[in-house]
Amino acid sequence: PETTVETINNGEALKVTFDSGILFATNSSTLSDASRSALRKLAVSLNENPDTDIKIVGYTDNTGKVDCNQTLSEKRAKSVYDYLMVDQGVSGRRMEYEGKGVHDPVASNDTPEGRALNRRVEILILANEKMIQDAQQGTLK
């Protein structure tokens, strides 16, 4: 799958996972046209739900040097962050990004299919304090 959405933390957050193959060319942190389209759709939802915080996390497979993969994962996460903020108007105050490189794989790096699954960007969408307070007070819109 190119993009998956799932609930995590007992339903307290959403995790949107983008296959890095649709976001970036190999060894690149420049967003592809297809990725801009997918991220544009996500940005509409993010802008319609301003009481959420966003964490963008980049990952790689284990091919190549660990430090190069770490840097690449950080640059890819920052590319998504910059696009959402600069091009789509999502507030930078509600977003953070990080790269995890080869850490936290979701599949075995022993097969091409597993490595493809590990090359990804995850966007975590979490309720912020205002949304939590509104939910507790019964005023959530």
What does each model-identified segment do?
Residues K41-T71:
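A short, charged
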Residues Y59-K141:
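Periplasmic OmpA-like peptidoglycan-binding domain that tethers envelope proteins to the cell wall
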Residues P1-D53, L126-K141:
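Periplasmic peptidoglycan-binding/tethering modules of Gram-negative envelope proteins
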